[in-house]
Structures are given as C-alpha cells and as structure tokens.
Amino acid sequence: MTKAELDSIKILPLEDSWYRRVKEKLDGIAKPLDGLGKFEHLIAQIGAIEKTTRISIQKKAVLVMCADNGVVEEQVSQSGKEVTLAVAKAMGVNNSSVGKMAAVAGVDVIPVDIGIDTDEVIPGVLPRKVAKGTKNFAKEPAMTEEEVLKAIETGIQLVQQCHRDGYEILATGEMGIGNTTTSTAVAAALLDLEVEQVTGKGAGLTDEALKRKCRVIEEAIEKYSLRDADAFTILKTVGGLDIAGLTGVFIGAAIEQIPVVIDGVISAVAALLAETLCKGAVNYMIPSHKSRELAETAIMKNLHLDPVLDADMALGEGTGAVMMMSLLDVALGVYLQGASFANFEIEQYKRYEE
C-alpha cells in the first residue's frame, strides 16, 4: 500500500432506512420504549451495517495485535519487553486473559505478531511481522512511512480474510509493553491535549515514573512539532506497530462493512486514527468500555461514541471488547426472540414528539 492508496480509500455511509427499520422492530417488542437503553442504538447500528433486520453476529473474532515499543528504553513501563513475547505465547495457546474470556463468550482469538522483538515463530500466533519493534521515539521517529503503511495494510488484509471466513463481527485487542505511552503520545498530539491530563500509570508506575513518562511524551511532541502535524505523521513518529495494525483493522472493517468493537485506550487511539485518515470509518465502530486510562475519555468524546461498560477496567488484550460482545448477544436475544405487543394482545407504546 502507498500513501496515495491510503488517502484514496472511501468509506460508504450507512443507510438510515435500515437503522429506522430495526428501531421500529425494537419498538414493537413488548417492553418500554428504549428499554434496552444504549443497546437499542447499537443493535440498530449493526442492522444498518449488515443491511438487514435479521441481525446476526454469531461468528465472532478478536484480532489481537502484538508488538514491542522502543520507547520502553526510557523506563516508561514497570515491565520489560520480554513480557510482550510471554503474553503472546500464552495467547497462542488460549491461556491469556482474553483467551479465557473469549472461550466463555464464544469468540475466536486471533493473535498477530505484527512487531514483537523476537526471531521466534510463536505457535498459534499469526506471523505478520513488519519489524522487530519500533525505534525509541525519544531519540528518533518510531517507524518509517513504509512500516506504517505495511502495518495498516496488514490490518486491512486480516479483516478481509476474516470476512471471507464468515466472521460477522470483530473485536480489537493488543499486547505490547509500552503501548500506553505510545497511545497517549498519539492522542495528546492529535487532539492537542495537555500530556499530564491524559497520561495514566499504565500497568503500574510510581509517581516518579509517571512524571518521567509524561516528560518523555511531552519532549517528543515538542521535538517533532507534532501538535501541528497530520495524523499519519503523528502515528509514524510516536505510535506503535500494534496501533498502526489496529488502525488498519478499523479501516478494513469499514471497507468490508463489518461491525468492529473498540476495546480500551490503545484500540481507541487506533479508532481515532482510522476515522481521521478515512472519514466515515467511525460508523462501523462499536464502543465497549470506559478505560481507566485518561486519554480514552477524550477520544470517545471526539468520536461521539458512548461506551456502555464502566467497570474501571485496564486489562487490555481485547478483554473489554469481548465482554461487550457477550452483552450484545444478550441484548440481541430480546430483539430477535422477544414477544411483540401483538403476541400479548396489548396496545403498543407510542412515541410522542418531545
């Protein structure tokens, strides 16, 4: 993929008529109007994406992008990069947190080595390595233009393959030590936010280490003049291969017209990048949960998305998105199988203009 090819991608808008039809069917179910709350909008959105009132999200997968980040050299994380490889290995045998959740939720886990700093071929993990991790953005740009484009293209291609394999809804996940630093750097630069206001402790930092993390991010933003840069340049300079790959997943889902669930802050940053690079991609995105990471709130506000879950989660791997898939299944149970007012021989609730 070239930059010109990325810039030329056009996302088709959703058809309002399908959204309205699903909402009308929801209103005909024997329950209070909007009784399922936010889920009614999400169900109607999925219907508009699928262009049907007979919604199906039975075949599900979570794409987990695994990659290392050179900025870990700056001691911005409690753990070293060896943890990325260890967790990826666990994912390959469904022994990580997302694997256990996905087994309960009926979701297939597809872990992807898009940039782990290792020469190992990891059993159960798709080998799609663009590079063995990024460079330390405190010293030099994290990626080349070619690496970013390859990672985005990889994400798009993975979605296309999932579509061919019959998957009806996808979730996004990631694993990469240091990626709360990269994601916060991207969000702060892209949304022109104060670094201290959107930087969290990640997997656990002391107050002193948090200050160092903020300093590393702020210095990089200033060094590369990122507050005046475009989204692609920001991603290339302080982002990660996992973020770039997930950006491709969101773009690919919009191209293939498949609903895709956002997980926490790292995938939320990728969602923001996807919408910035390819306007309209957000219409195919389903928010899941409010992350403990501070930047996520600002991103959701910018995307005009409203996460359903508020459980103070910060686990990563796609776990929040997988939980959201379970809740969508439950809500769809009412939509697909719920009795109508006619079944009960009672009058349907009417909507009145407010």
Residue ranges of predicted features:
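N-terminal loops that bind phosphate or other acidic moieties
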Residues: T2-E354
